[in-house]
Curated annotation (Swiss-Prot):
Metal-binding as UniProt keyword: no
Domain of life: Eukaryota
Full protein name: Zinc transporter ZIP6
Signal peptide coordinates: 1-20
Glycosylated sites: N67, N229, N254, N271, N672
PANTHER family: SOLUTE CARRIER FAMILY 39 (PTHR12191), ZINC TRANSPORTER ZIP6 (PTHR12191:SF22)
């Protein structure tokens, strides 16, 4: 009996010695510092799980680290590749949204959290969810393994290995809250992700602002502090979760925030053990979609709206003010309207307006009106997305957004290329035809001079013959007949100079240099830019070819029936007969409505972002410059003083401010209405550019003014290409244009 008792005591002593040695051996393993479970637990091969985790860590460090350490830059690249480096805005269709999410989680065997095809179950199954993320919370107070709520498989072994190592991350600053709220659409969003304030969940000697050095002793001390806090924390919420710590309902942790939230310095390279502490937070961000914003959620849209609203008011007011001051610029440029330099300037400005208007329509407004290039994923292959799950969307969201955006930009640029190609073809053909016509006229001119000389000689010869006949038949004619016959040649001779003078005038009209010198200044003064045509009489063939800057000053071709000096006086009388009051109301209402539409477009564009408002403002500025100059010239022609003209232009500009305010309110408070405003504005811009301005660029008579047609051609091409280039640069780099306003 005594022998049996001694054997039992020896075995008991041996077991008591073996267990501490086994725990010390497990603690020496680089990935675990505490062994709380046997090698086989609930059918899980713990050693295999640890080995597999070590393999995956080695793969990550091989790709992103150097010398068995991971730098902050490498960590940022890792976050970028898995798609959680910054906030992205996506749109998920409700028909397959829940099924896709459910299938993704079912692939990972999270059956306990997704049983009803809805993310509302996150709130109901929060206990299981938190146990999966923090499996060691009840390990000291309960003998039950919290992993039992999960499914079976290899994924569960990863949770088992993570369970033992979460205890090592004793810094209570590893706070990445995943509190979900139920929304009407059936989707969930991250409510709070914030490092808690020191003193609430942290030990008194631990602060997130000054993370301590990561050593084994400090980890042990923080472990004791964590267990102390764990004993007083709520069992349902867990020590790692905090509510109402941030006013912002969404936060995407970047590399620096993840490191500081875990009590790690951003300048210290990470080893495998330290990186192991960050893995639950990284997986948590992917699972919580904290770096994604669903456009179907109204709450998710609030932060960007608040930011863009400030930009919209400030940027829109500045843009409208600058454009409205163009009317004052007309006061300076009116004295220059009779000079050749002004013609070249207007030609360049009109071409620039065509380039910016069409470029803004094709490269910015139309792509933004579809709202697909930076707001959503592609829905062309929903079946593939459901099969691969939302994780596939997370990994490829950035590439999809950039490729889709630039795809729309290149397609718009291709459309502009087709427009520019047809402009070149028609313009070159017109120049060739005009060159041939001029050559023919130069060939016909000597022939007409020869005809005049021949007619002069014939008239002299006929007069001599008639005189000789008079002398021969003098005796046979009566006195009255002789008087009548003698008057015939004199009458013929008297009529001949009139005929010759008329022919000379006709020939001179073919190249009326002096007349044109008188007509051109009047024509430039009498035409003004507007978007409607008058019904006054049209000019003859000479005036038909004289479409000087019809795109700028084109609705007052007032009675240009012949290029004489009195036509200027007649046109001025017509303007005065219309009445100053009538013309003023026409400018205020017509230009006011036009300015209102411009302000509406600018306001809606600024609610979309700074780059969007900038591109639209540039386009409006370029086409309003010749517009305002033309309106100012017409008001002065009607007999107004400079002060009155400035006043009426200012009144019409006030409607632009009203349009801007309307566009901001619509774009900010009405969902998706700004996209329709973009589409409408694109149509207006295309009409003004292609219908009003391009035809007059093609049908100018620069050579009749002593100017080179090819000079105008190259100047117009330079203006159009410059406008295209400005809009293209804004379109490509608009996501990098950032301007913050802090009040």
């Amino acid at each position: 009996m005594a022998r049996k008792l001694s054997v039992i005591l020896i075995l008991t002593f041996a077991l008591s010695v073996t267990n501490p040695l086994h725990e010390l051996k497990a603690a020496a393993f680089p990935q675990t510092t505490e062994k709380i479970s046997p090698n086989w637990e609930s059918g899980i091969n713990v050693d295999l799980a640890i080995t597999t985790r070590q393999y995956h860590l080695q793969q990550l460090f091989y790709r992103y680290g150097e010398n068995n350490s991971l730098s902050v830059e490498g960590f940022r690249k890792l976050l970028q590749n898995i798609g959680i480096d910054k906030i992205k805005r996506i749109h998920i269709h409700h028909d397959h949204e829940h099924h896709s999410d459910h299938e993704h989680h079912s692939d990972h065997e999270h059956h306990s959290d997704h049983e009803h095809h809805s993310h509302r179950n996150h709130a109901a199954s929060g206990k299981n969810k938190r146990k999966a993320l923090c499996p060691d919370h009840d390990s000291d107070s309960s003998g039950k393994d919290p992993r039992n709520s999960q499914g079976k498989g290899a994924h569960r072994s990863e949770h088992a290995s993570g369970r033992r190592n979460v205890k090592d991350s004793v810094s209570a600053s590893e706070v990445t809250s995943t509190v979900y709220n139920t929304v009407s659409e059936g989707t969930h969003f991250l409510e709070t992700i914030e490092t808690p304030r020191p003193g609430k969940l942290f030990p008194k000697d631990v602060s997130s602002s000054t993370p301590p050095s990561v050593t084994e002793k400090s980890r042990g001390s923080r472990l004791a502090g964590r267990k102390t806090n764990e004993s007083v924390s709520e069992p349902r919420k867990g020590f790692m979760y905090s509510r109402n710590t941030n006013e912002n309902p969404q936060e995407c942790f970047n590399a620096s925030k993840l490191l500081t939230s875990h009590g790690m310095g951003i300048q210290v390279p990470l080893n495998a053990t330290e990186f192991n502490y960050l893995c639950p937070a990284i997986i948590n961000q992917i699972d919580a979609r904290s770096c994604l914003i669903h456009t179907s959620e109204k709450k998710a849209e609030i932060p960007p709206k608040t930011y863009s609203l400030q930009i919209a008011w400030v940027g829109g007011f500045i843009a409208i003010s600058i454009i409205s001051f163009l009317s004052l610029l007309g006061v300076i440029l009116v004295p220059l309207m009779n000079r050749v330099f002004f013609k070249f300037l207007l030609s360049f400005l009109v071409a620039l307006a065509v380039g910016t208007l069409s470029g803004d329509a094709f490269l910015h407004l139309l792509p933004h009106s579809h709202a697909s290039h930076h707001h959503s994923h592609s829905h062309e292959e929903p079946a593939m997305e459901m099969k691969r799950g939302p994780l596939f969307s997370h990994l490829s969201s950035q590439n999809i957004e950039e490729s889709a955006y630039f795809d729309s930009t290149w397609k718009g640029l291709t459309a502009l290329g087709g427009l520019y190609f047809m402009f070149l073809v028609e313009h070159v053909l017109t120049l060739i035809k005009q060159f041939k016509d001029k050559k023919k006229k130069n060939q016909k001119k000597p022939e007409n001079d020869d005809d005049v000389e021949i007619k002069k000689q014939l008239s002299k010869y006929e007069s001599q013959l008639s005189t000789n006949e008079e002398k021969v038949d003098t005796d046979d004619r009566t006195e009255g007949y002789l008087r009548a016959d003698s008057q015939e040649p004199s009458h013929f001779d008297s009529q001949q100079p009139a005929i010759l003078e008329e022919e000379e005038v006709m020939i001179a009209h073919a190249h009326p240099q002096e007349v044109y010198n008188e007509y051109v200044p009047r024509g430039c003064k009498n035409k003004c830019h507007s978007h409607f045509h008058d019904t006054l009489g049209q000019s003859d063939d000479l005036i038909h070819h004289h479409h000087d800057y019809h795109h700028i000053l084109h609705h007052h071709h007032h009675q240009n029936h012949h290029p004489h000096s009195h036509s200027q006086r007649y046109s001025r009388e017509e303007l005065k007969d219309a009445g100053i009051a009538t013309l003023a109301w026409m400018v205020i209402m017509g230009d006011g409505l036009h300015n209102f539409s411009d302000g509406l477009a600018i306001g809606a564009a600024f609610t979309e972002g700074l780059s969007s408002g900038l591109s639209t403002s540039v386009a409006v500025f370029c086409h309003e410059l010749p517009h305002e100059l033309g309106d100012f010239a017409v008001l002065l022609k009607a007999g107004m003083t400079v002060k009155q003209a400035v006043l009426y232009n200012a009144l019409s500009a006030m409607l632009a401010y009203l349009g801007m305010a309307t566009g901001i309110f619509i774009g900010h408070y009405a969902e998706n209405v700004s996209m329709w405003i973009f589409a409408l504005t694109a149509g207006l811009f295309m009409y003004v550019a292609l219908v009003d301005m391009v035809p007059e660029m093609l049908h100018n008579d620069a050579s009749d003014h002593g100017c080179s047609r090819w000079g105008y051609f190259f100047l117009q091409n330079a203006g159009m290409l410059l406008g295209f280039g400005i809009m293209l640069l804004i379109s490509i780099f608009e996501h990098k244009i950032v301007f913050r306003i802090n009040f």
